[in-house]
Every structure is written in C-alpha cells, then in structure tokens.
Regions:
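Short, surface-exposed ligand- or partner-binding patches at beta-edge/loop junctions that are enriched
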Residues: 83
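Rhodanese-like catalytic fold shared by cysteine-dependent sulfurtransferases
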Residues: 1-23, 30-79, 90-137
Length: 137
C-alpha cells in the first residue's frame, strides 16, 4: 500500500489551514528540532507532532509506528502530513503510516530545509525558505 502522495510545503500549509483534523508530523531528529528549528502551527491553534524516523545515530526508530499511533490514532479520514529535512525520510514515514491504517498520509517535498544547492548548502527551498511559520527552540 502506497502513501497518498507528495505535496509542496505550500500545499501542506493550505491543507493544515483548511482542515482542522489534519496533523503535521515532523520526523527529523531531536538535534534537528533543537538546532535548526521547527514548524510553528500556533497560528492555527495546533501543535506539531514530533517523532523521530531515525535516531540521531542514524539507526531507524523501531518504535515509530507505535509512537505515531499514540499521537495519531488510525483513521481513514484524517490527513497526516510528514515532514523531514528534505523530503526523503518522510516518504518512509508516510508509507509506514499508511500501512498502519493512518491515511491519507502525505510527504512534504523539499521538507523543512530543502535539498543541497550547487554550493552544498540547504535552505533555498522547503518549509522555512518559502516563509511558512517556524521557530527555534
């Protein structure tokens, strides 16, 4: 079973803004949340769900689905949007969520920081780069 598809950061924001049932799950590591920043949904009166897909040491979080189900019980009518650094880890998270009955599950293209540019830097695309709400902790 495949996830619902890829959406841009702007489409993710619109979905979250228009559907009060929609959930944003940030699957980056704790270090990324603390040192890079996080999406800010306070303007929508909601919180982001934070669950690591991989641990800081790069090992897969074997409890990901269990932790996800604790925060987002399986329903077939609640859109769940998965965000990582650049839109790669969140694909695996969206696939795992879909297999667990959490659907529709979407991957955010370009993630929070975007892909590397020709100079090896991130930040030219993604949630933060297009000016969507975010904060540093």
């Amino acid at each position: 079973m495949s996830y619902a598809g890829d959406i841009t950061p702007q489409q993710a924001w619109e979905l979250l803004s228009e559907n009060p049932e929609a959930v944003l799950v940030d699957v980056r590591t704790d270090a990324e949340w603390r040192f890079v920043g996080v999406p800010d949904l306070s303007g929508l009166g909601r919180d982001v769900v934070y669950i690591e897909w991989n641990r800081t040491d790069g090992k897969r979080n074997d409890n990901f689905v269990t932790e996800l189900l604790d925060h987002v019980p399986a329903r077939a009518d609640r859109p769940v949007v998965f965000l990582c650094r650049s839109g790669n880890r969140s694909i695996g998270a969206a696939e795992a969520a879909t297999e667990a009955g959490i659907a529709p599950s979407y991957n955010v293209l370009d993630g929070f920081e975007g892909h590397l540019d020709q100079d090896g830097h991130r930040g030219g695309s993604g949630w933060r780069a297009i000016g969507l709400p975010w904060k540093q902790s």
